[in-house]
Curated annotation (Swiss-Prot):
Catalytic activity: phosphoenolpyruvate + UDP-N-acetyl-alpha-D-glucosamine = UDP-N-acetyl-3-O-(1-carboxyvinyl)-alpha-D-glucosamine + phosphate
Gene: murA1
Annotated source species: Caldanaerobacter subterraneus subsp. tengcongensis (strain DSM 15242 / JCM 11007 / NBRC 100824 / MB4)
GO CC, any one term: cytoplasm
Residues annotated as binding UDP-N-acetyl-alpha-D-glucosamine: 92, 121-125, 304, 326
Protein name: UDP-N-acetylglucosamine 1-carboxyvinyltransferase 1
GO terms of biological process kind: cell division; cell wall organization; peptidoglycan biosynthetic process; regulation of cell shape; UDP-N-acetylgalactosamine biosynthetic process
Length: 415
């Protein structure tokens, strides 16, 4: 098993890159397929470890899955209510099966989730939502169990616009009696994609993409065909790669509205970004400017792009401040970037980055998915050779990242 990336200073990236289907869209959509009584066909499924885990998880419940060349066929006949630790420990998104199983069978038992080590990321908002709908929740021996004879629509206010909680409650509510209203709901494009898929199956959901989502309960959901939206974080990552290396790259299969905040920040740096028929063209500039960033829930600047932008800021002209408001403990890439010569100071949830002349290659490790991506980007511009360990994190969220970069002229390979 090749466990590290070796990256050498690369020429400006040039060419075209096609963005894969969105990981953060496909995981809840696969979970939602458990609600259907007929066959579901999903297209543009990214070939990722997290997706394989989610497929294994729904197979555990009795789903029949056939994945071929990005097309996933799912037939559901739920035989079990329990999701075991072996599967759930691999990623947090496993918990998204709780809403559908509870809605379909009135009983779900899911192991407490694992996944990326980013701060607390509690599931309490999910559980409060299920309780509001009438479920009894018990927690013990590492499992969460939910039971309900019948779920009933309610008004649910989320203390924080959590994406996972919004999705899980939305799925749990599709069969509930009456109307469920989620207030302070997350507005991410992935929520809209999930709602569109549920509606294709026969759900009655309005307001996805706003802070108030209204779900009118229905009796059953039928089969549907759906193409997953492109991955806005992968798109953003390749936009930054093109910008940092002074390249000229066409990003294909991107929904421009989904990356507006990234476009705004890169443009502020001096990068030239234009919409073309095939997608977005990103042209880097020499001596780009430092910019300040504050991560926020969508449509604000995504926390999932914070590490990549920090890598870019390490050699920008001037000083930038990055404030992380979404997740705690999300500066784990800082110590690794410092090993490469970056000048970064951390104070609480703020990072101050003073641009240096150049980074130097070093041996570093990916501590999580986006940290790994940031180190790959830093390696592209660092003098000499960078070795990035623990790249299994990167494989959880990027389809063949090194192959896509190599096709643009990057010097990167697995070892």
């Amino acid at each position: 098993m090749k466990t590290k990336f070796v990256v050498e200073k690369s020429p400006p990236l040039k060419g075209t890159v096609k963005i894969s289907g969105a990981k953060n869209s496909v995981l809840p959509i696969i979970a939602a397929s458990l609600l259907s009584s007929d066959e579901v066909i999903l297209e543009d499924i990214p070939s990722l470890e997290d997706v394989n885990v989610m497929i294994e998880l729904i197979k555990n419940f009795g789903a029949l899955c056939e994945l071929d060349n990005g097309k996933l066929k799912i037939k559901v006949d739920i035989k079990d209510v329990e999701a075991p630790y072996e599967l759930v420990k691999k990623m947090r998104a496993s918990f998204l099966v709780m809403g559908p199983i509870l809605a379909k069978l009135g009983h779900a038992k899911i192991s407490m989730p694992g996944g990326c080590a980013i701060g607390a990321r509690p599931i309490d908002l999910h559980l409060k939502g299920f309780q509001s709908l009438g479920a009894d929740i018990t927690i013990g021996h590492g499992y969460v169990e939910a039971r309900a004879k019948k779920l009933t629509g309610k008004k649910i206010y989320l203390d924080f616009p959590s994406v996972g909680a919004t999705e899980n409650i939305m799925m749990a509510a599709v069969f509930a009696d009456g109307v469920t209203v989620i207030e302070n709901a997350a507005e991410e494009p992935e929520i809209v994609d999930l709602a569109n898929f549920l509606n294709k199956m026969g759900a009655n959901i309005k307001g996805a993409g706003t802070d108030t989502i209204r779900i009118e309960g229905v009796k059953e959901l039928k089969g549907a065909e759906h193409t997953v939206i492109p991955d806005r974080i992968e798109a953003g990552t390749f936009m930054v790669a093109a910008a940092m290396t002074g390249g000229n790259v066409l990003i294909e299969n991107v929904i421009v509205d989904h990356v507006r905040s990234v476009i705004a920040k890169l443009t502020e740096c001096g990068v030239k970004i234009t919409e073309e028929k095939g997608g977005l063209r990103v042209k880097g500039v020499k001596n780009y400017k430092a910019v300040d960033i504050k991560t926020l829930p969508y449509p604000g600047f995504p926390t999932d792009m914070q590490a990549q932008m920090m890598a870019m800021m390490t050699v920008a002209k001037g000083t930038s401040v990055i404030i992380e408001t979404v997740f705690e403990n999300r500066f784990m890439h800082v110590s690794e970037l410092k090993r490469m010569g970056a000048n970064i100071k951390i104070e609480g949830r703020s990072a101050m980055i003073t641009g240096v002349d150049h980074l130097t290659g070093a041996e570093v490790k990916a501590t999580d998915l986006r940290a790994g991506a940031a180190l790959v980007l830093a390696g592209l511009i660092a003098e000499g050779r960078t070795e990035i360990n623990d790249i299994y994190h990167v494989d959880r969220g990027y389809v063949k990242m090194e192959e896509k970069l190599r096709a643009l002229g990057a010097k990167i390979y697995r070892k």
